Structure formats: structure tokens, C-alpha cells
């Protein structure tokens, strides 16, 4: 059933609201993907707080008009699924990971920080560790010298006690 004008305006407004908050937009062609596989992709996207939507390209073009993602409009051809996320890496990671296991999902383009990326750029962005991973690595690096120092002090204290006894 075709969308009437009000429905189209509502879709554009919804997507524009997501795009306004987004740091990353990823476009992927989904020709020939089974419904079950698309459902799995959507579930993975929900877990990572990625807004994933199949849209008419004309509606998507209107939604990105006047935003840093406007240059992506040139790439909006064919049957596309749009991944939009506030996290700089999440959309690229979700789409890239799924495309590895399902060759019918083909990454077409993406945009991050006002720059349009090709497939290789999206894959490079997806290979960056997530914010949580980076924070845990930083915490580990910061704790290592402190815990080593604490162990050295404990060993010194034990040695002094052994000498005193």
C-alpha cells in the first residue's frame, strides 16, 4: 500500500530526527536477503542502539537535506537499508559484521564526521574498537603500574617482617 503525503512527511520527520542526533550513517544494499536474516540484523542493531530502516531513497534524501550527511544523497540508489547511530562506530560495526556472514548485504557507502566513505572506509571505521573497549583498555593500562607498585610494597613489607622475626 503506497504511503500518502502525511505518512511520507511523518517518515521524513522521524528519520530527520534520527539523523540530527547521529554521528554515523551507513548505507547497504540488501538485494535478495531473506526476511529471517533481515530480522536478525534488526535485532543486532537494536542491541547496539542503531536505528536501522529500509526507506525509499527520495524520502531518505529529504531527511538528510541540510545536514552533514547531505553528500550521501548521491549514493542513494537501489534497494538500501540505512543504519543510523549516535555512536561513531556502532552502525558501521553492525552492518559490517552482518555483511561478513551474509554476502547478500553489500555495504555501499557511509558518512562520518561530514565525510562520505566508500565500502573500505566503512570497514575501516568498523574495525576501530568501541568506546567501552577503549575505556577498559585505558583503565587496564592505568591500573597496571599502580597494582605493580602495590605488589612491590607488599613484598617489601613481607621481607621486612621476615627479617624482623
Swiss-Prot record:
- One Pfam family assigned to this protein is Ribosomal_L10
Gene3D superfamilies, A to Z: 3.30.70.1730, 6.10.250.290
Enumerate the InterPro entries for this protein: Ribosomal_uL10 (IPR001790), Ribosomal_uL10-like_sf (IPR043141), Ribosomal_uL10_bac (IPR022973), Ribosomal_uL10_bac_type (IPR047865)
GO CC, sorted alphabetically, is:
ribonucleoprotein complex; ribosome
Which family does the record assign?
Belongs to the universal ribosomal protein uL10 family.
Quaternary state and interactors: Part of the ribosomal stalk of the 50S ribosomal subunit. The N-terminus interacts with L11 and the large rRNA to form the base of the stalk. The C-terminus forms an elongated spine to which L12 dimers bind in a sequential fashion forming a multimeric L10(L12)X complex.
Q: Name one GO molecular function term.
A: large ribosomal subunit rRNA binding
Official protein name in the record: Large ribosomal subunit protein uL10
HAMAP family in the record, alphabetically? Answer: Ribosomal_uL10
Example of a GO biological process term: translation
Keywords for the protein's UniProt record, in alphabetical order: Ribonucleoprotein, Ribosomal protein, RNA-binding, rRNA-binding
Function of this protein?
A: Forms part of the ribosomal stalk, playing a central role in the interaction of the ribosome with GTP-bound translation factors.
Amino acid at each position: 500500500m503506497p504511503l500518502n503525503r502525511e505518512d511520507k512527511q511523518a517518515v521524513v520527520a522521524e528519520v530527520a530526527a534520527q539523523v540530527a542526533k547521529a554521528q554515523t550513517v551507513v548505507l547497504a544494499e540488501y538485494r535478495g536477503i531473506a526476511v529471517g536474516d533481515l530480522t536478525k540484523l534488526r535485532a543486532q542493531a537494536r542491541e547496539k542502539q542503531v536505528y536501522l530502516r529500509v526507506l525509499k531513497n527520495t524520502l531518505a534524501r529529504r531527511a538528510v537535506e541540510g545536514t552533514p550527511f547531505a553528500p550521501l544523497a548521491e549514493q542513494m540508489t537501489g534497494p538500501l537499508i540505512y543504519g543510523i547511530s549516535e555512536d561513531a562506530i556502532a552502525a558501521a560495526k553492525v552492518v559490517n559484521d552482518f555483511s561478513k556472514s551474509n554476502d547478500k548485504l553489500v555495504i555501499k557507502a557511509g558518512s562520518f564526521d561530514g565525510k562520505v566513505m566508500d565500502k573500505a572506509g566503512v570497514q575501516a571505521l568498523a574495525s576501530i574498537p568501541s568506546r567501552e573497549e577503549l575505556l577498559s583498555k585505558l583503565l587496564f593500562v592505568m591500573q597496571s603500574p599502580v597494582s605493580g607498585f602495590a605488589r612491590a610494597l607488599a613484598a617489601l613489607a613481607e621481607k621486612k617482617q621476615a627479617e624482623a622475626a
